[in-house]
């Protein structure tokens, strides 16, 4: 006990140092220098001289350097050897090596000797503790660490066969029943383990002894022999229960345990001796005491199994030294792979890459499985009575988990060239055998009859139960007045997603929810039917009622009671409707916890027994603020998933339990107390990381959410302590829900007694607070509604005329209307296709955006309506939808002069010096207008006036305002004195020849109009414009100006907003 306490104190002292590694471990693993940190511990799994191990690593480094040079990678690869000399804790063997390993780690941290990979230790105890406590994404290569506790470690690679591989071989060999030498499947065995075995044998036998191991699960009988006397008694005894004994060691070990006793002919001893090569030497002769022994060992490299294994060449070095060399070559292989791919070797990806691969070892390819453990070919040897040599009986490929029989007619000691059955013979007691056989047959027949009767009664009960299937015609959709409701949470996507997942309907005049039973086709198994019947029988105040199942379309739904206020998670999130000052005070929080505890207490005592999916989203609130548990039962239909509410033991193993429900209750309690996100903690925000840390947290301080105990008063502290007891790491330390229910009742009494008021006083006070909160809520949401209405109106006014919007709001329709006289403006950019030819698409978009934003500002200063933009065409009308007498021609004319004046100053950013010419055409006359379409409606103009205005623009000239005679006639009727010139007769398609005019200005008002180009011939005009573009491009290249896209943010600095970007009137305290 004292030594264990010292070890625990030592580990706690080491923890701060080990956690400091994060900034030190990569000191020698970058900038072309890569080192291996090799732990040289005297207590290794084999008593191999440390110098041999160092020589093996150096030899491996020479091979790695050569391979890197051949790959043309100019890097430096070295090794740092860390010895245990001078350590405070220096152990004598592997079983006390934990502190020695941690001391070495501390020395590496202090001296910054850590390289890219840590090689060693080989002892299971030290390896497991180093992996567990470092908490680093750091690769470890071990020549040993055989125990099951080192299996499936993400950053640990083992170069020698672990106990798991041996266990799988024995299980598969026990199952063999169709080989020439083995016709019986074995189901029993003895295991000899006296505790003084070497490191490898200790862990191999420990794996076979473990009751939860794969080997123990498949055997019907297994017993462990711990003393040589027991071994000898079983070896010779007639009352033994198995003919097979498994032990580990050398032939000498077997002889020392057996002594001079003669072994019975039907005894089979499996001797595990993986790392001895003398069985393959020519001069090796098997002693007679090995006749009943099958030896399991590893053959030399490039060994091909056959009837005789003599004449092979065993390796000059031990398997342990070879493992250090192979580990060095593995590091070189991974380093070369990452460097050739341009990836860093200091990332978690590198630490987890030492698995599921094949690399070139010293004598051939070496394969690692997806857990980072080496795969080998194991051989099972027998003694040939003819030659007294060891021969191969069968081989086993650990990579494929495949047995390969080799011998067809082995000449071993057992009869008929076959291994005996594992069960000893019963002798000539034929009568007794017959009696037992007959009795067994009678018992089996009776059991079959009972089972058939039981099944018939159960099926009859299931048929009589009215659980079954609710006809789809009994499920009715909700009425319109039941589904329509006003909600100001316009952007609440989560509510919309929830409505899509669940369906609200009516069943038996009650509002219900249809829950989708995924992966279910309606053909329920017997187990599922029993679960559904249990759900029907569950009826409690704090549980939602289950009514049955229904099939809609091709999907199966569960019909469940509906609760109006939604899930508890939604209530906690809604701080407006349920503020802390009224509903969510401490009394109410304890009441909510008590409701959950009552529901779970009833559930655990019912036939359902366990929930398995308890979380805040599976706790719903009805209209009376009563919390009810839902989504329970049907675990065979809806298996539980890993999430933040799942207990750590169920994260590690996908099961459910009542204690796991208690843990889930504690996470919900933390949500209720703090009203923050699920599993709230300041140290971590990522959900997947939280689940990982809970699943892999061990020791005295597991990972849990935050509870701010320092700010809690005495009564609140009682609640916190209850929550902490519910999320204990040990499930047995957690209270049950009966205890939780009684504790909450006491705590509620403490809160209530302090205020010296009756329950009625408390109820009246809470109702008054709630009433005031509702008044404030209505006022606030009214303001929010008005602000949103104004935003919608403003958006509509930017899309349609104000009168049209008003008509749509009041009547729902817009009647088309005929206007006797309006003026329409058309303009386009001269040479637009030529400009596009010399510009990128984004430059064209930015050019049009800059021009038309300026046009829009000019339009805002006149009584006109912008109809649309089509490419480079800009269309404006006046006199509609509101008639303005003769002002329509005046406003269009003034607007056209303003636009032409602006174009005289406009310059393209990507084509400096190039003038932008536009043609403007104006015409007046009658037209019809109305809203066309339902989706994206537009206010459109129709009539010959529109076509004529377009013709006026197309027949005009650059930087000219081309006006028809009808427009000039209207201008003459006004008091405004416009200046214009007669152009002469112009041919207009569809109208013939008409007299048209150039608008040149306005008397008593100066316009800075650009000078139109003097070229009259259209062909010469196009040539001149193309020359201007070429000149602008040359100018841009000469000045080094690069085209750039103007940022949209720049428009805000000019005092106006971009398209459709309205001022945001949202409040942080709402979902608006």
Curated annotation (Swiss-Prot):
This is Guanylyl cyclase C. It is a single-pass type I membrane protein. It is found in: Cell membrane; Endoplasmic reticulum membrane. The protein kinase domain is predicted to be catalytically inactive. GO terms for molecular function: ATP binding; GTP binding; guanylate cyclase activity; peptide receptor activity; protein kinase activity; toxic substance binding. The gene is Gucy2c. Residues 823-953 form the Guanylate cyclase domain. It comes from Rattus norvegicus (Rat). It catalyses: GTP = 3',5'-cyclic GMP + diphosphate. Glycosylation at Asn-74 and/or Asn-78 is required for interaction with VIP36 while glycosylation at Asn-401 modulates ligand-mediated GC-C activation. Residues 23-429 are extracellular. Belongs to the adenylyl cyclase class-4/guanylyl cyclase family. Glycans are attached at residues 31, 74, 78, 187, 194, 306, 401.
């Amino acid at each position: 006990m004292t030594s264990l306490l010292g070890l625990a104190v030592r580990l706690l002292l080491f923890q701060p140092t080990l956690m400091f590694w994060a900034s030190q471990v990569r000191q020698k693993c970058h900038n072309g220098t890569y080192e291996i940190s090799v732990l040289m511990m005297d207590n290794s799994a084999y008593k191999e001289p440390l110098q041999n191990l160092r020589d093996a690593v150096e030899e491996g480094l020479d091979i790695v350097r050569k391979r890197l040079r051949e790959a043309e990678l100019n890097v430096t690869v070295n090794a740092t050897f860390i010895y245990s000399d001078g350590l405070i804790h220096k152990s004598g063997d592997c079983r006390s090596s934990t502190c020695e390993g941690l001391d070495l780690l501390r020395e590496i941290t202090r001296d910054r000797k850590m390289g890219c990979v840590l090689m060693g230790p080989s002892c299971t105890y030290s390896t497991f503790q180093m992996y567990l406590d470092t908490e680093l994404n750091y690769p470890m290569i071990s020549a040993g660490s055989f125990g099951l506790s080192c299996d499936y470690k993400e950053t640990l690679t083992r170069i020698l066969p672990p106990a798991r591989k041996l266990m799988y071989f024995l299980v598969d060999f026990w199952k063999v029943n169709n080989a020439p030498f083995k016709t019986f499947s074995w189901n029993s065995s003895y295991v000899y383990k006296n505790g003084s075995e070497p490191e490898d044998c200790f862990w191999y036998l420990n794996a076979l002894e473990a009751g939860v191991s794969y080997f123990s699960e498949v055997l019907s009988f297994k017993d462990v022999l711990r003393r040589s006397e027991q071994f000898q008694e079983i070896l010779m005894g007639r009352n033994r229960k198995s003919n097979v004994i498994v032990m580990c060691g050398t032939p000498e070990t077997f002889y020392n345990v057996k002594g001079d006793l003669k072994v019975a002919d039907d005894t089979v001893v499996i001797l595990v001796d993986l790392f001895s090569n003398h069985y393959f030497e020519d001069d090796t002769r098997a002693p007679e005491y090995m006749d009943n022994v099958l030896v399991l060992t590893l053959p030399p490299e490039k060994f091909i199994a056959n009837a005789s294994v003599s004449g092979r060449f065993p390796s000059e070095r031990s398997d342990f030294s070879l493992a250090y060399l192979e580990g060095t070559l593995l590091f070189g292989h991974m380093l070369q792979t990452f460097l050739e791919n341009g990836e860093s070797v200091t990332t978690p990806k590198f630490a987890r890459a030492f698995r599921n691969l094949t690399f070139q070892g010293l004598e051939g390819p070496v394969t690692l499985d997806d857990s980072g453990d080496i795969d080998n070919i194991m051989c099972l040897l027998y003694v040939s009575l003819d030659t007294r040599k060891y021969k191969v009986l069968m081989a086993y490929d650990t990579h494929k988990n495949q047995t390969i029989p080799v011998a067809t007619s082995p000449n071993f000691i057992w009869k008929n060239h076959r291994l005996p059955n594992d069960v000893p013979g019963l002798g000539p007691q034929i009568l007794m055998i017959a009696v037992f056989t007959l009795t067994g047959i009678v018992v089996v027949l009776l059991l079959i009859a009972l089972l058939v009767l039981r099944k018939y009664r159960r099926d009859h009960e299931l048929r009589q139960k009215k659980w079954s299937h609710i006809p789809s015609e009994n499920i009715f959709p909700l009425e319109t007045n039941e589904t329509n409701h006003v909600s100001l949470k316009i952007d609440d996507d989560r509510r919309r997603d929830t409505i899509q997942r669940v369906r609200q309907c009516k069943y038996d005049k009650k509002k219900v929810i249809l829950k989708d039973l995924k992966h279910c086709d309606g053909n329920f198994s017997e187990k599922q039917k029993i679960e559904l019947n249990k759900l029907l029988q569950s009826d409690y105040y704090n549980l939602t009622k289950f009514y049955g199942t229904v099939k809609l379309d091709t999907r199966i739904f569960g019909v469940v009671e509906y609760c109006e206020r939604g899930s508890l998670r939604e209530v906690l999130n809604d701080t407006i409707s349920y503020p802390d000052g009224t509903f969510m005070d401490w009394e109410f929080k304890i009441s909510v916890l008590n409701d959950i505890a009552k529901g779970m207490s009833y559930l655990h005592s019912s036939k359902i027994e366990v929930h398995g999916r308890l979380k805040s989203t599976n706790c719903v609130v009805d209209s009376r603020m009563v919390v009810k548990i839902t989504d329970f039962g049907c675990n065979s239909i809806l298996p539980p998933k890993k999430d933040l509410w799942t207990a750590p033991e169920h994260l590690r193993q996908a099961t459910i339990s009542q204690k796991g429900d208690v843990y889930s209750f504690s996470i919900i309690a933390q949500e209720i107390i703090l009203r923050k996100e699920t599993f709230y903690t300041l140290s971590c925000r990522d959900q997947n990381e939280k689940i990982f840390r809970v699943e892999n947290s061990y020791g005295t301080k597991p990972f849990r959410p935050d509870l701010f105990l320092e700010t809690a008063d005495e009564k609140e502290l009682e609640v916190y302590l209850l929550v902490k007891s519910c999320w204990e790491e040990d499930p047995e330390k957690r209270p049950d829900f009966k205890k939780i229910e009684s504790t909450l009742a006491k705590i509620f009494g403490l809160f209530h007694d302090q205020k010296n008021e009756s329950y009625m006083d408390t109820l009246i006070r809470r109702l008054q607070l709630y009433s005031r909160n509702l008044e404030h809520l209505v006022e606030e949401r009214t303001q929010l509604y008005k602000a949103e209405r104004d935003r919608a109106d403003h958006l509509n006014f930017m899309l349609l005329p104000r009168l049209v919007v008003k008509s749509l709001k009041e009547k729902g329709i817009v009647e088309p209307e005929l206007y006797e006289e309006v003026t329409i403006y058309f303009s386009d950019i001269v040479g637009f296709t030529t400009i596009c030819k010399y510009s990128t698409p984004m430059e064209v978009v930015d050019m049009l955006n800059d021009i038309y934003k300026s046009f829009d500002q000019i339009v805002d200063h006149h009584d006109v309506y912008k109809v649309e933009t089509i490419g480079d065409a800009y269309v404006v009308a006046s006199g509609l939808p509101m008639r303005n007498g003769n002002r329509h021609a005046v406003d269009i004319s003034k607007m056209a002069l303003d636009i032409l004046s602006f174009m005289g100053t406009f310059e393209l950013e990507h084509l400096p010096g190039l003038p932008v010419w536009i043609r403007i055409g104006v015409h007046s006359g009658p037209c019809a207008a109305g809203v066309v379409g339902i989706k994206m409606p537009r206010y459109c103009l129709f009539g010959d006036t529109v076509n004529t205005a377009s013709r006026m623009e197309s027949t005009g000239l650059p930087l000219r305002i081309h006006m028809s005679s009808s427009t000039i006639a209207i201008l003459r009727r006004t008091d405004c004195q416009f200046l214009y010139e007669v152009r002469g007769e112009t041919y207009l398609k569809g109208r013939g020849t008409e007299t048209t005019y150039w608008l040149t200005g306005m008397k008593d008002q100066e316009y800075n109009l650009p000078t139109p180009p003097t070229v009259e011939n259209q062909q010469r005009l196009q040539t001149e414009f193309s020359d201007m573009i070429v000149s602008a491009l040359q100018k841009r290249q000469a000045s080094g100006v690069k085209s750039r896209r103007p940022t949209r943010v720049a428009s805000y600095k000019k005092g106006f907003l971009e398209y459709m970007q309205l001022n945001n009137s949202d409040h942080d305290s709402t979902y608006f």
